[in-house]
């Protein structure tokens, strides 16, 4: 690297530091004093279910006053308690209301009633990366790199706030109208200064240290980034099998095989991210995220332009207008029932 290039890199890294310091100030204000009860169910017209989960569903809704469409996550308090997800749910809302980054889905309102918790988020009509990836088969390396760069920046932001995301997978990445990523589902995100021990995540994406019940840190997100980049570029994840236990055996073995079409730069980056040895895993070394940002596979990436959303996206989802749900699957509809008695009031008092 020439002197001029090195100086440019140095000043870029300095301005990133300043940016993150300011971002942390903004985050901490909201983290310490979370917004509560900023809307009411009656203000929204419920249109269609966009997805379902073990303790709730996500619905497309329309704010009657403004006519804006949103995605409303509805969680059944009793089911959350039964599935021991109180802490995770409180974390999700507290984190989402405090963060602010171009590739994180925005929480617009949150509230609760006798039966449910509600998180009303920006509606991202392009649907999940998962469905586009399955339809197309696999993404070209430049296409995969465009998405990967956004995740790198997002993790750099989250980690600077002591947040671990812990649930990276194509199902949690929505594609917006400009073709950029919106990370959704902060159900497993957690603010951790040191290490944490909870077993959570999706089998194919779990880092070896989580499987081995070791204390783990932010490095699990960089491992998951390796899994995601592999899956985007190959069309299938690096470790897969019929049963989770077989997947776990492959993950901890430290052996990865690459398709022959992977470039040598891509393979090199993935070997450094899918690195079982934490003392060698990129993102976890003394240069932190810069080992990833300065890697040859990202040589053509203009990080600032990606952050500013100035790079032309490789793919724009089809979109027929506000409230279009054609990029989402159909689900059986169900009435939202609200009890006349308050359920689990104590458990969710801080929501």
From Swiss-Prot:
Catalysed reaction(s)? Answer: L-seryl-[protein] + ATP = O-phospho-L-seryl-[protein] + ADP + H(+); L-threonyl-[protein] + ATP = O-phospho-L-threonyl-[protein] + ADP + H(+)
Broad class of where this protein is predominantly found? cytoplasm
Instruction: Please provide, in alphabetical order, the Gene Ontology terms of the cellular component aspect for this entry.
Output: acrosomal vesicle; axoneme; cAMP-dependent protein kinase complex; centrosome; ciliary base; cytoplasm; cytosol; glutamatergic synapse
Tell me which residues bear the N-myristoyl glycine lipid modification: 2
* Domain Protein kinase per the UniProt entry, residue ranges: 44-298
Describe activity control: Allosterically activated by various compounds, including ATP. Activated by cAMP; the nucleotide acts as a dynamic and allosteric activator by coupling the two lobes of apo PKA, enhancing the enzyme dynamics synchronously and priming it for catalysis.
Could you say which tissues express the protein in this record?
A: Ubiquitously expressed in mammalian tissues.
**InterPro entries found in the cross-reference section:** AGC-kinase_C, Kinase-like_dom_sf, Prot_kinase_dom, Protein_kinase_ATP_BS, Ser/Thr_kinase_AS, STKc_PKA
| UniProt modified residues of type Phosphotyrosine | 331
Q: Looking at the record's lineage, which domain of life comes first?
A: Eukaryota
| Residues found modified as Deamidated asparagine | 3
Residues binding ATP = 50-58, 73, 122-128, 169-172
The GO molecular function terms of this record are: ATP binding; cAMP-dependent protein kinase activity; magnesium ion binding; manganese ion binding; protein domain specific binding; protein kinase A regulatory subunit binding; protein kinase activity; protein kinase binding
Any keyword Nucleotidyltransferase?
Answer: no
List, alphabetically, the Pfam families matched. Pkinase (PF00069)
Location comes to:
Cytoplasm; Cell membrane; Membrane; Nucleus
**Which residues carry out catalysis?**
167 (proton acceptor)
- The keyword Nucleotidyltransferase appears for this protein: no
**What processing steps or modifications follow its translation?**
Autophosphorylated. Phosphorylation is enhanced by vitamin K(2). Phosphorylated on threonine and serine residues. Phosphorylation on Thr-198 is required for full activity. Phosphorylated at Tyr-331 by activated receptor tyrosine kinases EGFR and PDGFR; this increases catalytic efficiency. Asn-3 is deaminated to Asp in more than 25% of the proteins, giving rise to 2 major isoelectric variants, called CB and CA respectively (0.4 pH unit change). Deamidation proceeds via the so-called beta-aspartyl shift mechanism and yields either 'D-Asp-3' (major) or 'D-isoAsp-2' (minor), in addition to L-isomers. Deamidation occurs after the addition of myristate. The Asn-3 form reaches a significantly larger nuclear/cytoplasmic ratio than the 'Asp-2' form.
**Residues with Phosphothreonine modification:** 49, 196, 198
What range(s) does the AGC-kinase C-terminal domain occupy?
299-351
Kindly state which keywords UniProt assigns to this record, in alphabetical order.
ATP-binding, cAMP, Cell membrane, Cytoplasm, Kinase, Lipoprotein, Membrane, Mitochondrion, Myristate, Nucleotide-binding, Nucleus, Phosphoprotein, Serine/threonine-protein kinase, Transferase
Its biological function? Phosphorylates a large number of substrates in the cytoplasm and the nucleus. Phosphorylates CDC25B, ABL1, NFKB1, CLDN3, PSMC5/RPT6, PJA2, RYR2, RORA, SOX9 and VASP. Regulates the abundance of compartmentalized pools of its regulatory subunits through phosphorylation of PJA2 which binds and ubiquitinates these subunits, leading to their subsequent proteolysis. RORA is activated by phosphorylation. Required for glucose-mediated adipogenic differentiation increase and osteogenic differentiation inhibition from osteoblasts. Involved in chondrogenesis by mediating phosphorylation of SOX9.
The record describes its quaternary structure and partners as: A number of inactive tetrameric holoenzymes are produced by the combination of homo- or heterodimers of the different regulatory subunits associated with two catalytic subunits. cAMP causes the dissociation of the inactive holoenzyme into a dimer of regulatory subunits bound to four cAMP and two free monomeric catalytic subunits. Activates cAMP-sensitive PKAI and PKAII holoenzymes by interacting with regulatory subunit (R) of PKA, PRKAR1A/PKR1 and PRKAR2A/PKR2, respectively. Interacts with NFKB1, NFKB2 and NFKBIA in platelets; these interactions are disrupted by thrombin and collagen.
What's the protein called, per UniProt? cAMP-dependent protein kinase catalytic subunit alpha
Query: Whose protein is this, by species?
Result: Bos taurus
This protein's encoding gene:
PRKACA
